[in-house]
Regions:
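C-terminal outer-membrane/trafficking sorting elements
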Residues: 458-535
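Extracellular S/T/G-rich loop segment that most often corresponds to the catalytic His/Ser-adjacent loop
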Residues: 314-404, 408, 445
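Inhibitory N-terminal propeptides of secreted protease zymogens
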Residues: 21-136
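Short pre-catalytic strand/loop immediately N-terminal to key active-site residues, enriched for Gly-Thr
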Residues: 200-209, 378-390, 430
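C-terminal subdomain of the subtilisin-like protease fold in secreted/lumenal serine endopeptidases
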Residues: 147, 266-270, 373, 404-459
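Protease zymogen maturation seam
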Residues: 114-170, 182-184, 331-343
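Short acidic, glycine-rich surface-loop motifs adjacent to enzyme active sites
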Residues: 237, 257-281, 299
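Subtilisin-like serine protease catalytic core
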Residues: 22-23, 33, 37-39, 92, ...
């Protein structure tokens, strides 16, 4: 029966979509092989020639997508996994993955070259080393007040004036762990086996033996509205340990764990790590997480001030990359700059957040405070650190505020709102550019520009909802069509609430600069239609 079942599954999978790539060694691994003695083993990742494509599944079909990824990987890796034991002690630490179709292992040079000749192998790359080292800082006591960075992005205005703190939203991280008992978190770790993963030391309860992970999570959702170091103090969180002090990395395992959580997966994963270069290793992994409905944000890196220093995955066009600013809103000297490396035509540019990224390769997408940021440490103290590692969780926190207001936001919508509501300055322009992106994060403007959840349903209950006009394509466009209703009155407001024009007919918004605007439609003495956001 098992044989029949495998044949049937294989027959089905052969009809399912997949991505195919030709076999090659990455340049970094080729250089390393040239310097490796015959008996030494290298940490490598063998990518299969075919990759499952879950983008064709209907949105929200998480269980079917994950099962397809697992089945596709299991069947396509079967023959290779059966072959590896023949190499004896030349191969060890074999670990198959399904979040991408590949196998991590330690192997000698001759084994690597032999595997490359297989028709089912598409690429072999070196498993990278990422060191997350705590930056020098001074321990400081808790201060009863706002930190400069929280006030700078106006997160406190979101709590006070708009009433959003991230409540009901779950933030995850891929970092050095988190001390969930730190007083700043106030019991907001979600708890349970689906809220912590440690592929490094396999501990069952969260911990952080470094400090970096606790610090970054504190920025995203630490503290409270009365005494806050965090942007979204009402959010809960889950955590993983992907790094240790020796540079061992288990990012792939953490991403796969998140993908397997299903309805328990976090809304957002904050990533304060990256690798210099133009590798596409995380491309399919992060795309799969995105398709599964998990929002992600990545630190741009700390290799500035030269251009072209942005690390990956922040450099990928389907995710948000964040640079770092100082207390005076200038770009930090160490903040990595664009442009991104050229990755080739890996997939349709329709999946890119920035519509013109293919030509501009612009990164970062935006910046956030990264210098002298005070947050929680791995014990019960606080520490001031500087890095784009500190910048990225600011954006993750703002995303939590936005998602509390509207949990149905898509990645393109989030990107559009964040970039169109940034603060820009007389220096560093014109914007957007390869240093600041679209500008510095503004939490208040971003949440204000976020359309409330269920706006269509509320509009349907309004007397004016019978006006049959639509925004095409919804929700972001430079125009919208109002067929057959030239007599309606439309008022447009900018992000500050200032009315910028009143229109009749079919030239609504004509002459306005690109940006986010609010539209109110009225007819006669009827009540205005609920605010609709367009670009």
């Amino acid at each position: 029966m098992r044989c029949v079942k495998q044949v049937l599954i294989l027959a089905v999978l052969l009809l399912m979509p997949c991505l195919v790539q030709a076999g090659y060694l990455t340049p970094d691994l080729q250089a390393k092989l040239d310097q490796t003695s015959p008996n030494d083993k290298l940490k490598v990742i063998v990518r299969m020639a075919e990759e499952a494509d879950i983008s064709v599944f209907p949105q929200g079909q998480w269980e079917a997508m994950v099962q397809y990824l697992k089945d596709f990987a299991a069947i396509s890796q079967t023959d290779l996994l059966a072959t590896l034991p023949r190499y004896g002690n030349k191969v060890s630490q074999i670990k198959p993955f399904w979040i991408y179709n590949g196998i991590a292992m330690e192997a000698t040079k001759d084994v690597v070259l032999n595997l490359l000749r297989r028709p089912d192998v598409g690429c072999i790359e070196e498993k990278g080393i990422i060191k997350i080292e705590p930056l020098p800082g001074k321990k400081e006591p808790r201060v009863n007040g706002l930190e400069w960075n929280i006030a700078r992005i106006q997160a406190d205005r979101v709590w006070r004036e708009l009433g959003y703190t991230g409540r009901g939203i779950v933030v995850g991280n891929i970092d050095t762990g988190v001390n969930v008992n730190h007083p700043t978190f106030g019991g907001r770790w979600r708890g349970g086996s689906n809220s912590w993963f440690d592929p490094i030391n396999h501990q069952s309860y969260p911990y952080d033996d470094n400090g970096h992970g606790t610090h970054t999570m504190g920025i995203a959702c630490g503290g409270s509205t009365a005494d806050s170091i965090g942007v979204a103090p009402g959010a809960t969180f889950v955590a993983t340990k992907a790094f240790d002090a020796s540079g061992n990395v288990e990012v792939d395992a953490c991403m796969q764990w998140y993908a397997g959580l299903g309805s328990a997966a976090p809304n957002i994963i904050s990533n304060s790590w990256g690798v210099i270069g133009n590798s596409t290793h995380y491309w399919q992994i992060t795309r799969n997480l995105q398709i599964l409905g998990i929002h992600q944000v990545y630190a741009n890196g700390n290799s500035g001030p030269d251009s072209g220093t942005v690390g990956y995955p922040a450099s990928y066009p389907h995710h948000i990359g964040v640079g770092g600013t100082t207390t005076s809103d200038t770009l930090a000297s160490w903040s990595s700059r664009g442009p991104s490396p050229y990755f080739g035509a890996i997939e349709s540019s329709a999946n890119y957040l920035d519509p013109v990224w293919a030509s501009s390769r612009r990164k970062p997408d935006l910046t956030a405070p990264g210098l002298n940021v005070r947050s929680a440490w791995y014990d019960t103290t606080y520490r001031v650190l500087s890095s784009t590692s500190m910048s990225a969780p600011h954006v993750a926190g703002v995303m939590a505020l936005m998602l509390e207001k509207n949990p149905n936001l898509t990645d393109p919508q989030i990107w559009q709102i964040l970039t169109s509501t940034c603060d820009t300055f007389s220096w560093g322009g014109p914007y957007p550019n390869q240093n600041y992106g679209w500008g510095r994060l503004n939490a208040y403007r971003a949440v204000l520009a976020t359309p409330p959840s269920g706006v269509d349903e509320e509009a349907a209950r309004s007397p004016v909802s019978r006006l049959p006009f639509s925004v095409r394509p919804n929700p972001f466009t430079s125009f919208f069509a109002v067929p057959g209703h030239e007599t309606e009155c439309f008022s447009l407001y900018d992000i500050s609430g200032r009315r910028v024009g009143t229109y009749r007919g079919d030239r609504i918004g004509e002459g306005l600069q690109a940006g986010v605007y609010f539209v109110r439609a009225a007819k006669g003495d009827q009540k205005p239609l609920r605010v609709v956001k367009v670009r």
